[in-house]
Amino acid sequence: MSSNATDLTTGFIASIVAIVLFGSNFVPLKKYETGDGMFLQWVLCAAIWLVALVVNLILHCPKFWPFAMVGGCIWATGNIAVVPIIKTIGLGLGILIWGSFNALTGWASSRFGWFGMDAEEVAKPVLNYIGAGLSVVSAFIFLFIKSEIPNNTYSVDTTPLISEHVINKTQDPDPDCSWVDKLSTAQSHLVGCSLAVISGILYGSTFVPIIYIKDHSKRNDSIYAGASQNDLDYIFAHFSGIFLTSTVYFLAYCVAMKNNPKLHPEAVLPGFLSGVLWAIATCCWFIANRSLSAVVSFPIITAGPGFIATMWGVFMFKEIQGRKNYLLMMLAFCIILTGALCTAFSKI
C-alpha cells in the first residue's frame, strides 16, 4: 500500500472515531445535575489535561510551543456557552448548529490562508467548495428544527463551562434556577441558536495557532523554524491552554459567587469521563489533520457528530419530536453526508 493510501486510510479511520466520540461525549452527563456548569467545566478540563499528559509522555515530551496554548484558550472560551446551549435547544440540535459553523470557519481559514496560515490546496477544489457549501446549507436547516427540553433535565447536559460571571450576578434567588430557565420558548430558541453559532466560530478557530506554527516552521527566518509537522506534538500545549483558561474562569466565578460556588459532586465522575472521551476524540482529529489536512478533515469531523448526537436526542432523550422535525433532520443529514463525501473525494 502506498504512503498516500496509508495516510488516507489512517485519516478516515481517525475521523470516524472522532465523530463517534464527539457525538457521544456529553451523554454520560445527561442523567446528572450540573448546576450552572462552572465546576463541571473545570473537572472536564482537568480530565482533558491528564489525557494530554499521557500522550505527551508517550511521545517522549516533544518541544513545548506556548503559542499553541492560544488555541486551547479559544476553545475554552467558546465552551463557556455549552451548558446554556444544551439547556435551551438540546444536545442534538446544539451540536448540529455549532458543528456546522465550526466546519465552515475551520475550512475557510485553512482553504484561504486566514490569520497568517498558508492556503491549502486540494486535488479537486470544486468538490471541496461544494462540500463546504453544503455544510452551510445544513446549518440553516437546523435552525428551523424545534427541540423540547424536559424541565427535570434542564442542566444535566454537557461539558463545559457556562455563563459568564456577569450572568451569575443576576441569577434568580432559587439556587437551582439560572437565567436560562427564565427565558420563554421563543427566547430560548433564539438565545440557544445564537450562542451555538458563536461557539461554533470559536471552535473553528481553535487549530489556527498550531497550523500557523507548522506553516512557519518551513521558513528559516521564523521563530518557529524547525517546529514539528506532527500535530500530536502540540497536544500538550493545546490542552494546557484549555486547562489554564478554564481554571481562570472557574476562579473568577468563585470570586463572583463570593467563594460559594455551586458544586455537584455526583457529576464529577461522569464529567471526568466526558473529558476523557473529548480528549481522545481531539487526538484523533489531530491525526486526521496530519493525514488528510485541515481543509478536508474539518467538514467531515465537524458535521458527523451532529448525526450521532441527534440520534441520542431522538431515541434516548426525546428532545426532538414531530414529523416536520424528523423530515428536516433527514434532509439535513442527507446534505451533510453529500457534503462529507464531496470533501473526502476532493482529496483523492
Swiss-Prot record:
GO molecular function, one term: carbohydrate transmembrane transporter activity
Similarity comment text for this entry: Belongs to the TMEM144 family.
Name of the protein described by the UniProt record: Transmembrane protein 144
Record-level GO cellular component terms: membrane
Transmembrane segments: 8-28, 39-59, 64-86, 93-115, 125-145, 193-213, 235-255, 267-287, 295-315, 326-346
Primary location: membrane
Pfam families associated with the record: TMEM144 (PF07857)
Keyword Transmembrane helix: yes
InterPro entries according to UniProt: Sugar_transport, TMEM144
Secreted in keyword set: no
UniProt membrane topology term: Multi-pass membrane protein
PANTHER family linked to this entry: TRANSMEMBRANE PROTEIN 144
Signal peptide: none
Localization per record: Membrane
Keywords: Membrane, Transmembrane, Transmembrane helix
Annotated source species: Bos taurus (Bovine)
